[in-house]
């Protein structure tokens, strides 16, 4: 969660584009992992520090907060122990049933569990926007309908579903063809419907070449659309290569995609099973990035070197 096992990164965000003249209401959606992994050491407690003195907005007891019970942890199979996050389950039946309560001040800047706060050295993710997917419909022979959509390449993405449900309580599962990347369970998602029309984006990113949505046959579900939002490290492709051999050209493109899908808040060995900064993998990725990506990638390289000692 930070530059070392004890301290914490903070983000600097420009609120101006989100504010309008007059009264504004500011809301944050906080995801507390509640577990450690190869790339994250849990603080043991959820919390938020916010400080914008120029507009008199600070994170004190005047804030109201609520635990969103609609967000839960999905059942088995759970993610393997290497991953920092858990699989998200969202129960749409519980939307809007949570009440706000006064927040509790946990301590000042520099106190536990945050300790020293260090400005995050890399940019926020590059958001490519929501894009539609074409899909096929099949049955698995075990009572389930499966929507299968081919992604344009192996991407870091969040799935977006738009459907009508005749009844509430239908479990919809979302996963990719990399669900067992490296032979152990990786990130997937679950959604429980409410009755009527609904649209949902699962915010836990996953990766793969193919998105699959699974739900019971004859459950009264009608899908209106299926989509995805790709996000990734915020840089541009600048290096290029071409030849008269299409096989070599395709190989170069696949190598470029392999590089990009293995970088986010750090370089990592794989985007599915571990997402961890194994140095043997990092040195290969860093060397490639200098040739293929814009100088924005240098911030990620510097961060990798600085955190290597931990």
Positions of predicted regions on the chain:
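Extracellular/oxidizing-compartment recognition motifs
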Residues: 1-272, 281, 296-308
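Well-ordered alpha-helical scaffold segments within catalytic/enzyme domains
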Residues: 284-295
């Amino acid at each position: 969660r930070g530059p070392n096992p004890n301290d914490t990164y903070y983000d600097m965000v420009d609120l101006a584009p989100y504010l309008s003249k007059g009264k504004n209401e500011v809301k944050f959606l906080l995801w507390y992992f509640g577990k450690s992994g190869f790339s994250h050491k849990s603080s043991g407690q959820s919390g938020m520090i916010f400080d914008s003195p120029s507009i008199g907005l600070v994170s004190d007891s005047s804030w109201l907060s609520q635990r969103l019970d609609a967000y839960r942890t999905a059942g088995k199979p759970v993610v393997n122990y290497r991953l920092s996050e858990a699989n998200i389950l969202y129960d749409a039946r519980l939307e809007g049933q949570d009440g706000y309560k006064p927040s509790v001040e946990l301590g000042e800047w520099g106190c536990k569990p945050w300790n020293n706060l260090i400005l995050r050295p890399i940019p926020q993710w590059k958001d490519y926007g929501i894009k539609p997917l074409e899909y096929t419909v099949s049955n698995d022979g075990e009572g389930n309908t499966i929507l299968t959509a081919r992604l344009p390449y192996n991407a870091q993405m969040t799935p977006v579903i738009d459907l009508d449900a005749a009844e509430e309580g239908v479990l919809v599962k979302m996963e990719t063809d990399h669900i067992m990347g490296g032979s152990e369970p990786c990130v997937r998602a679950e959604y429980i419907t409410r009755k009527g029309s609904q649209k949902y984006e699962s915010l836990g990113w996953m990766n793969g070449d193919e998105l699959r949505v699974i739900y019971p046959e004859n459950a009264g579900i009608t899908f209106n659309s299926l989509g995805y939002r790709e996000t990734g490290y915020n840089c541009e492709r600048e290096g290029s290569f071409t030849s008269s051999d299409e096989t070599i050209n395709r190989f170069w493109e696949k190598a470029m995609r392999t590089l990009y899908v293995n970088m986010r808040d750090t370089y990592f060995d794989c985007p599915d099973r571990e997402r961890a900064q194994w140095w043997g993998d990092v040195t290969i990725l860093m060397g490639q990035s200098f040739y293929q990506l814009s100088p924005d990638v240098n911030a990620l390289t510097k961060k990798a070197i600085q955190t290597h000692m931990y």
